[in-house]
């Protein structure tokens, strides 16, 4: 582009004919011009001679004759045409390069329009129909969801990279899935089965869920409901050598348990076996009505629900006691005891018995030394009440003239007054 602008300058046109044709041919080869008219114009410039720098002063009558210059008007027209065409061509080149640069910069820098984590963009992307979702589909970096590229939602370089990684992982997963399916199919061909990787995964998941459910139900059963009486009943059956109808053989289990507790079983009636049996409450009511098959070991030929005859007891000492209970026994004389004398003495009033000496007596009676000290002490003066003490008569009111005639009292010292007052008080207390 720069060399073409130099060609059209008047200094360049004033060169020699051979040098001008060589340089023009080189530029024509280097520039890929879409129009053939431009080549013809440039080749026709080599025919003209430029003797002076101002595009030639002479006038050319015949264009085919040598030694004459063309008219400046035609030369100016040719130069204007070349410059105008090159300007259009340069504008197209600049426009294309600017578009390419802008698109390249858009792919390099991050787009902050649709991938900033805003909820409205995500909702529009997910609520839009599939017919609108045209173009690339990328995974949002913030929400890890697929977002389609619509107007206002640009895809940056980071999203393109994530999309490519997602495609690569998907392809790897497909390849691995094929390998797994071939392995499973080869393994299952021996057993006559054919499973895909998806079915195998579902089967393993179902097994895991089944195991979890079993463990959960096992943990839900309380320890009181984990068959605590079954072992006891089996032990009772082992003693009786009977194991056929264990949970429903009422009287047998009750008898065994009561023998363990040291009690004699009651007569085996139907009502009694249902109400008093401790294990019958835990057996279902349907089991009580169904008769059980007899066993050889027990030698029981009748149904357990039918009342059995009472077995005769062996003769014992209690038989004589039962016969004696009907005859009233004579009162047996009691042996003489100390209580008989006590009953006779109860009618006579007893003298008051002296109390035994205790520690409190010493506290109540002071020792001799304290008694003697109390005797030696002089008796304390008796305190008189306010009513018993003779009240001194109130002084009579005297007139001023009589009061002035009386002699004035002598002034006494404070110490004498205090001693005199104390002696008078003690005299009143001692000699009332």
From Swiss-Prot:
<dbReference type="Pfam" id="PF06409">
    <property type="entry name" value="NPIP"/>
</dbReference>
<comment type="similarity">
    <text>Belongs to the NPIP family.</text>
</comment>
<dbReference type="InterPro" id="IPR054697">
    <property type="entry name" value="NPIP_N"/>
</dbReference>
<feature type="region of interest" description="Disordered">
    <location>
        <begin position="260"/>
        <end position="280"/>
    </location>
</feature>
<dbReference type="InterPro" id="IPR009443">
    <property type="entry name" value="NPIP"/>
</dbReference>
<protein>
    <recommendedName>
        <fullName>Nuclear pore complex-interacting protein family member B8</fullName>
    </recommendedName>
</protein>
<feature type="region of interest" description="Disordered">
    <location>
        <begin position="353"/>
        <end position="420"/>
    </location>
</feature>
<feature type="compositionally biased region" description="Basic and acidic residues">
    <location>
        <begin position="374"/>
        <end position="402"/>
    </location>
</feature>
<feature type="compositionally biased region" description="Polar residues">
    <location>
        <begin position="270"/>
        <end position="280"/>
    </location>
</feature>
<feature type="compositionally biased region" description="Basic residues">
    <location>
        <begin position="408"/>
        <end position="420"/>
    </location>
</feature>
């Amino acid at each position: 582009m720069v060399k073409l602008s130099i060609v059209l300058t008047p200094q360049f046109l004033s060169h020699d004919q051979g040098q001008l044709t060589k340089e023009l041919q080189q530029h024509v080869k280097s520039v890929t011009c879409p129009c053939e008219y431009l080549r013809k114009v440039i080749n026709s410039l080599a025919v003209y001679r430029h003797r002076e720098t101002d595009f030639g002063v002479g006038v050319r009558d015949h264009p085919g004759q040598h030694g004459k210059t063309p008219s400046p008007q035609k030369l100016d027209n040719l130069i204007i045409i070349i410059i105008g065409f090159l300007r259009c061509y340069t504008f197209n080149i600049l426009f294309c390069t600017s578009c390419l640069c802008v698109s390249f910069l858009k792919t390099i820098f991050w787009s902050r329009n649709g991938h900033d984590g805003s909820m409205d963009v995500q909702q529009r992307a997910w609520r839009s129909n599939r017919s609108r979702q045209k173009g690339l589909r990328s995974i949002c970096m913030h929400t890890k969801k697929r977002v389609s590229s619509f107007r206002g939602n640009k895809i940056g370089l980071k999203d393109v990279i994530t999309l490519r990684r997602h495609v690569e992982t998907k392809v790897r997963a497909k390849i691995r899935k094929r390998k797994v399916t071939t392995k499973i199919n080869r393994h299952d061909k021996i057993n006559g089965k054919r499973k895909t990787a998806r079915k195998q995964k579902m089967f393993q998941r179902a097994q895991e869920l089944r195991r979890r459910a079993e463990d959960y139900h096992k943990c839900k059963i309380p320890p009181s409901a984990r068959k605590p009486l079954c072992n006891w009943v089996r032990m009772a059956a082992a003693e009786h050598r009977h194991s056929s109808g264990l949970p429903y053989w009422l009287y047998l289990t009750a008898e065994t348990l009561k023998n363990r507790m040291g009690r004699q079983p009651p007569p085996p009636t139907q009502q009694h076996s249902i109400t008093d049996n401790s294990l019958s409450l835990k057996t279902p009511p349907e089991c009580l009505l169904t008769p059980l098959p007899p066993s050889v070991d027990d030698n029981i030929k009748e149904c357990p629900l039918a009342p059995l005859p009472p077995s005769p007891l062996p003769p014992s000492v209690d038989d004589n006691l039962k016969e004696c209970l009907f005859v009233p026994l004579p009162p047996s004389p009691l042996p003489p005891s100390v209580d008989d004398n006590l009953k006779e003495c109860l009618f006579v009033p007893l003298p008051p018995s002296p109390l035994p000496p205790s520690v409190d007596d010493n506290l109540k009676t002071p020792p001799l030394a304290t008694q003697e000290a109390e005797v030696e002490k002089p008796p304390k003066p008796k305190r008189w009440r306010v009513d018993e003490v003779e009240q001194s008569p109130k002084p009579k009111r005297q007139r001023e003239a009589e009061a002035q005639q009386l002699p004035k009292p002598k002034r006494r010292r404070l110490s004498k007054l205090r001693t005199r007052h104390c002696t008078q008080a003690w005299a009143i207390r001692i000699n009332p």
